[in-house]
A protein has these predicted regions:
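An N-terminal domain-cap segment
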Residues: 1, 8-34
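Residue-level detector of flexible, active-site-proximal loop/helix-junction positions
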Residues: 13, 58, 91
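C-terminal terminal-subdomain/extension
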Residues: 72-164
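Residues at the C-termini of beta-strands that transition into short coil/loop
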Residues: 10, 55, 88
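Intrinsically disordered, low-complexity and often Lys/Arg-enriched segments
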Residues: 1-2, 164
Length: 164
């Protein structure tokens, strides 16, 4: 993967995976009328395409330092690598920033993307380190407890991919 790109993930796949993993975020709360886009980046890890979702920047993020699994994208969003999950690439739709209708949202996404590109190496290194840490220390450290169950989700990803 030469350049990092932004993707939107299929909401049915999120619904499917979230029944197996408590750390997986849904893109719509029960009280919401509209779903928000589940946007992130895709990285190749252990032979799988891993979707790494972007999360909205919150007030608490201002005082947090970056760690192996937590990367700030300016003051626009954050990347929680512990929340990444495997996804069939055909369920990931590339985000074309120029096609985004809302100018404010387009500018936000453009700014996020610029910073993500600048941090590509850090993101790739940390993602692989988080993955390896989880596989080696499953449940034995705070970091591994925060992580999705990558092994389980890889199995569920394979099963889902066979059905599509």
């Amino acid at each position: 993967m030469d350049t990092i790109e932004l993707y939107e993930i299929d909401s049915d796949y999120i619904k499917y995976l979230s029944s197996f993993e408590q750390h997986l975020f849904r893109n719509k709360k029960v009280t919401q009328v509209f779903t928000r886009k589940y946007i992130g980046i895709v990285l190749k890890i252990n032979g799988f395409d891993y979707f790494v979702p972007l999360s909205s920047f919150k007030e608490k993020h201002k005082r947090l330092c970056e760690t192996k699994d937590f990367i700030k994208v300016g003051t626009f969003s954050v990347i929680n690598l512990n929340n990444m999950f495997p996804a069939p690439i055909n369920l990931c739709k590339k985000v074309i920033i120029a096609d985004l209708k809302d100018i404010h949202y387009r500018n936000l996404v453009r700014s996020e993307y610029r910073i993500i590109r600048q941090k590509t190496q850090l993101i790739l290194q940390n993602a692989k380190a988080v993955y390896e840490h989880k596989m080696i220390n499953d449940g034995k450290s705070k970091l591994s407890q925060r992580c999705n169950n990558f092994k389980l989700l890889e199995e569920k990803c394979k099963l889902y991919a066979k059905k599509i």
